[in-house]
Amino acid sequence: MQKKKGYVSFVLHAHLPFIHHPESDDYLEESWLYEAISETYIPLLKNFKKLVDEGVDFRITMSMTPPLLSMLDNKLLQQKYIKYLERMIELSKKEVKRTAKNEQVNKLSHYYLDRYSSDLHLYKDVFKCDLISQFKHFQDIGVLEIITCGATHGFFPILYVNEKTVKAQIAVGVQTYKKYFGKQPRGIWLPECGYIPEVDKYLKEFGIEYIITETHGILYADPTPVYGTFAPIVSPGGIVAFGRDIGSSRQVWSSVNGYPGDYNYREFYRDIGYDADYDYIKPYIAHNGVRVHTGIKYYRITGKTENKDYYNLQWAKDSVERQAGHFFDCRNMQIENISQYMNKPPIILCPYDAELYGHWWYEGPYWLYTLFKKIYYDDCNFKLITPSEYIDKYPEMQVATPCRSSWGANGYNGVWLNPTNDYVHKHLHTAGDRMCELAQNYPNAKGIQQKALNQCARELLLAQSSDWLFIITNGTMVDYAKKRIKDHIGRFTKLYHQIKDNKIDKDFLKDIEEKDCVFPEIDYRIYK
């Protein structure tokens, strides 16, 4: 057996913006959550359980953001997800009949029927609609470390115009984590990996020990880190920073050379929501008749061609095992080369969006399972580790200030501040200043005034979500993103004036409390 010379640390960022529409039974954007549960969260949980049952000692870290936790805990969304699964089972049964004369497609339609039926059984009967407890279980037995995030994924480098709004994002993030996991989080995934040194004092105040940064956040730190991204640094403010490894990231992330582009893998963009006859598929697409992804996909990537071949489950499995072996060999070689120049074992940090695994890269959760099993059983020079474990083992670190950075395109603030969305920020900053004004002027509010102030805090936080700015920049669901910003700023502003005029509209307040029911324990005084 080779001597262990280093470590690999996987960090998956599980996040969705808070989307909750009790006014509609079929709101298109709520399907983002249902797809993530079926394609990412349940497959990850199934593979974690499989590894534990097989006696495989593995380690993985996940950030679970407060909006995601709030949605997973929401009773209405839980019932809507069950209805979503029942609808998918109904469609899958129709597909089994429709494809009876095509053996290859029929096999896949049976596969989808089995998968959605299994999801329903697991979610309803085994998990009792409680995915959070399932993830907590794996943290409690020591194979998973869960870390927190900003309250609504607000982008700190721009919000810091009013630093109290960043403090509130961190405070509510930590508070939400404690509510669901019963302990203090040691790490935080800074939203969009957006780092500025000024936030260290607030991270420290709320007990955060470490952050994840983009590669250049470490490489351009001051002074230059001796070991680059292969060892964490600690800021003068006492916050440990782990930087993303370039090589392992490209192997998974790259749209050109990354593993998810393998020709045997499932083609994300070919879905019966677009391919099937319109009248046939209409009951299963958006209520306004717009074609959308259903999750039933029969083709593999095949190549750079419009003529796609049918998806073959065994071929995809073979590619997974080959690529897990390739990643394993690359990390083995990388650590062999690096370790000889270091006086402590290197750590290769591999952070990714959780939704890459399963949603975008359908085979991703099985790839993790295959890789973790290989690391445990095969002869290699590294082990899996969490950032917290590495800090505990190797507490001595170089002191350096990470560079201002993000993991957005070009590495800084441009995705969230550019000509497509710059008009939003004056409204966010004005609302932030007004929230601080309210907290200062009404320190002892009670009754309906207190409820209105707490709702103001919720509306501000929801408006600050970086997701809306990202969507506007990318030009995807732009109308929805703009509507969400307008709604939350509008609700905040209306409440602000009602509080100032001492004329709070109880019906209006009740309505938005039901719609924007995130963070029930929030205390507006965090903005003082």
Predicted stretch roles:
Residues S63-L68, G150-T152, G187-I196, P387-D392:
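Short, solvent-exposed turn/loop segments enriched in Gly/Ser/Thr/Pro and often Arg
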Residues M64, L190, I212-T213, Y352:
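Conserved beta-strand positions
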Residues L76-D140, I146-Y160:
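Active-site-proximal, glycine-rich beta->alpha crossover segments in alpha/beta enzymes
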Residues E163-L190, C330-M342, P346-L349:
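CE4/NodB-like, metal-dependent polysaccharide N-deacetylase domain
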Residues P185-Y195, D353-Y357, M477:
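Conserved short loop/turn motifs at secondary-structure junctions
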Residues G194, V199-I208, T224:
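Hydrophobic, small-residue-rich alpha-helical packing segments that form membrane-like cores
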Residues I208-A221, I385-T386:
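His/Asp/Glu-enriched short active-site or ligand-binding loop at hydrolase and phosphoryl-transfer sites
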